[in-house]
A protein has these predicted regions:
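Acidic di-acidic motifs
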Residues: 8-10, 86
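Conserved sequence signature across two-component system core domains
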Residues: 7-8, 37, 54
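Helix N-cap/capping motif at the beta->alpha junctions
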Residues: 36-42, 65
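Two-component/phosphorelay signaling modules centered on CheY-like receiver
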Residues: 10-35, 74
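Non-catalytic signal-transmission and effector/linker regions of two-component phosphorelay proteins
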Residues: 1-5
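CheY-like receiver
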Residues: 45, 51-125
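Conserved binding/recognition cores within well-folded domains
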Residues: 114-162
Length: 162
């Protein structure tokens, strides 16, 4: 199951994205658990590191999606972020937060379906047994398969990964 967060202040756009995802799920047999947030502040406050994929609007009242993505990256380096926006000019900044893609509004199911396979391939890189490790106030997800060995020095634990 892929856990998805949709952060979109426009209810119609959020529901349209949810409908497109549900149609894809029914057609391809991929199960989604979708949570919706109408603003970035609420999303960040409630974020528990369980999302695999975040669809983030950029232009929202209060904290915009780009600022929210920067804060999200401070907490979770591996979650897949996709911007859903009519503001293509933010593309360069999106790469600074390692955005997987940009989907331009208004949403189009055909164009979305062309991109979703590539997006889900990034999500699959997060799958598998993993552990969450806190370091310097940040949480990191480490895939068990990527751990070569673990070293203990005093009270420090060092993970050596591939």
């Amino acid at each position: 199951m892929v856990k998805i967060a949709i952060v979109e202040d426009c209810k119609e756009e959020a529901l349209k994205l949810q409908d497109i995802l549900n149609a894809y799920s029914a057609r391809e047999g991929v199960k989604f658990d979708i949570s919706m947030y109408d603003n970035a502040d609420k999303f960040l406050f409630e974020y528990d590191h369980s999302a695999d994929l975040v669809f983030m609007d950029i232009e929202m009242p209060g904290m915009n999606g780009m600022e929210a993505a920067e804060k999200l990256r401070e907490e979770d380096e591996s979650v897949v972020i996709v911007f859903v926006t009519n503001m293509a000019g933010f593309a360069v900044r999106g790469y600074q937060v390692d955005a997987a893609d940009f989907i331009v509004k208004p949403l189009n199911a055909y164009e979305f379906n062309l991109k979703i396979e590539r997006i889900l391939s990034r999500v699959k890189m997060r799958e598998g047994p993993s552990i969450m490790v806190e370091s310097d106030g940040k949480l990191y997800r480490i895939l068990a398969d990527s751990i070569r060995y673990i070293e203990v020095e005093g009270h420090d634990v060092i993970f050596h990964t591939t």
